[in-house]
């Protein structure tokens, strides 16, 4: 499944349309009610489901981009013969492909060594993702996504969607201190969770303070449902006091 969108499309308008087809773009951000798809492309966005699904660059299939010569080009993954044809072009587009290819070939070791060893990197200019030596695929989108519009102006995106998976379970863990947090997170990751989120005692106090406002937004029925879901946690806090950190691990699908 995929969708073709323009950069000005707000995610809050986009998601309901995908949900009608029981699919979703999983790399949405916490600010999904405010952001547009163009900003998400430029920022190589990620969010609560990134642990399982990854970032925006893993879902871009092709794009239309205006380069500095003022012309619009289709940017999509190319195999080696297609790349060779692009580099033969006596145009600005051909020069772009020749320059990037030359940069990668002449600095291969440095580029590989410069790649951050992290689970999430949205710093931009991920040139190490452009050429895949194993698959022999060259994808300039991997450089453009996350570049904040500095390398070109995106006018259209073709993005991959994934099936919506129902929430199977959520484990809520109360931590009296942070001593074993790292070890606990690694244990939680063994069940292949969709997300692991946390909030501290200050955030919890803030949530209690404005809980009535949340109920107003959800409505009486929605607020009651939310309250019932967290009855066990409320009793736990009554027994043990306010936790230093609450860790929420969500699993979906067949996990």
Model features per residue range: what roles?
Residues 1-29, 41, 45-99, 118, ...:
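N-terminal glycine-rich flavin-associated loop
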Residues 182-185, 189-255:
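Terminal amphipathic helices with adjacent charged low-complexity linkers/tails
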Residues 79-137:
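Phosphate/pyrophosphate- and phosphate-bearing ligand-binding catalytic cores of soluble enzymes
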Residues 11-13, 35-36, 72, 81-83, ...:
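Flexible loop/turn segments at secondary-structure boundaries
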Residues 122, 130-151, 164, 168-169, ...:
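Long hydrophobic segments that form regular secondary structure
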Residues 40-49, 137-161:
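Conserved phosphate/anionic-ligand binding catalytic regions in large, soluble enzymes, centered on
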Residues 36, 67-68, 146:
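Short, acidic, Ser/Thr-enriched surface-loop or helix-capping motifs
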């Amino acid at each position: 499944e995929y969708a073709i969108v323009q950069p000005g499309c707000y995610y809050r308008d986009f998601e309901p349309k995908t949900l009608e087809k029981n699919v979703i773009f999983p790399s949405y951000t916490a600010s999904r009610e405010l952001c547009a798809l163009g900003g998400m492309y430029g920022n190589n966005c990620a969010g609560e489901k990134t642990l399982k699904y990854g970032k925006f660059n893993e879902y871009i299939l092709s794009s239309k981009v205006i380069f500095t010569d003022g012309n619009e080009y289709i940017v999509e993954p190319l195999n080696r013969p297609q790349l060779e044809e692009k580099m033969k072009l006596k145009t600005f587009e051909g020069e772009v492909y020749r320059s990037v290819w030359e940069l990668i070939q002449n600095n291969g070791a440095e580029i590989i060594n410069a790649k951050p060893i992290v689970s999430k990197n949205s710093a931009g200019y991920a040139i190490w993702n452009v050429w895949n030596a194993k698959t022999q695929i060259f994808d300039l989108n991997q450089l453009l996504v996350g570049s904040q519009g500095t390398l070109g102006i995106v006018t259209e995106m073709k993005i991959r969607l994934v099936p919506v998976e129902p929430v199977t379970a959520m484990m809520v863990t109360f931590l009296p201190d942070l001593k074993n947090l790292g070890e606990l997170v690694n244990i939680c990751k063994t069940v292949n969770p969709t997300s692991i989120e946390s909030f501290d005692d200050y955030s919890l106090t803030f949530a209690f303070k404005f809980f009535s406002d949340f109920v107003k937004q959800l409505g009486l029925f929605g607020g009651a449902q939310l309250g019932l879901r967290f009855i066990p946690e409320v009793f736990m806090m009554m027994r043990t006091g306010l936790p230093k950190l609450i860790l929420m691990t969500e699993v979906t699908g067949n996990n």
